Amino acid sequence: MIGGLFLNTLSFVIVSNHPIVNNTANVHHIQQERVIVQQHHVVSARTQNYYPEFSIAVLFVSFLALYRSTNFKTCVGILMFKILSMTLLGPMLIAYGYYIDGIVTTTVLSLRFAYLAYFWYVNSRFEFILYNTTTLMFVHGRAAPFKRSSHSSIYVTLYGGINYMFVNDLTLHFVDPMLVSIAIRGLAHADLTVVRAVELLNGDFIYVFSQEPVVGVYNAAFSQAVLNEIDLKEEEGDRTYDVS
């Protein structure tokens, strides 16, 4: 779509697919048939050549309409490019005679925008269009894309420290993690609370949000835990002094 991606498509075939008229008055019937046959072969060859390029253009527009990112600045840039494509690039292609390219570009992007605008209207949050997704999680007013887990179960894990956690590109500070809650809105609707805070060996935490309480956390890296415990015992043994 940029830099001539749409210059070789089926719309060019439509412009080129005009009957070849021989203005000479004294043309035999056999020659006219040969001209028609040659014209048919030329148009068929052009159509076969432009089908793959048209398919690539359609796939590119579809990819652009569905592409999403978790980075805020990237999402802003992509959204601005989509708006320019719908309002400027699509009509420009139509004005220059590339009707199929312009119609496909404008229609696909507009339909995607209208679909996301429904969630924007229902939830009164523009982030559905910004992040190009139908489901968002809100942590104390801050929006971030929600990634579905396996088996369509709804839970969220956030990485952080003893008094903070990372929400996408933002850092949320808190006093008590039990006061932090997550609201899932869009295609899924759920309210999650902190059910477990897992402390890592380096001092960081992984906060687990779920609708169901967590019974326990299994330490799969038991060898690392055993080695760490041995190191602590050796340090304590080195600090033991004989006072007798």
UniProtKB/Swiss-Prot annotation:
**Has UniProt tagged this entry with the keyword Transmembrane helix?**
yes
- Return the GO cellular component terms, semicolon-separated: host cell membrane; membrane
The lineage's top-level taxon is Viruses
Give the record's keywords alphabetically.
Answer: Host membrane, Membrane, Transmembrane, Transmembrane helix
Locate the CoV 3a-like viroporin CD domain: which residues?
A: 135-214
Pfam families recorded for this chain? Answer: Corona_NS3b
Topology in the lipid bilayer is annotated as:
Multi-pass membrane protein
TM region(s), chain numbering? 47-67, 75-95, 102-122
Q: Which residues form the CoV 3a-like viroporin TM domain?
A: 41-131
Compartments it resides in: Host membrane
According to its UniProt record, which protein family does this protein belong to?
A: Belongs to the coronaviruses NS3b protein family.
Q: What is this protein called?
A: Non-structural protein 3b
| Protein source organism | Porcine respiratory coronavirus (strain RM4) (PRCoV)
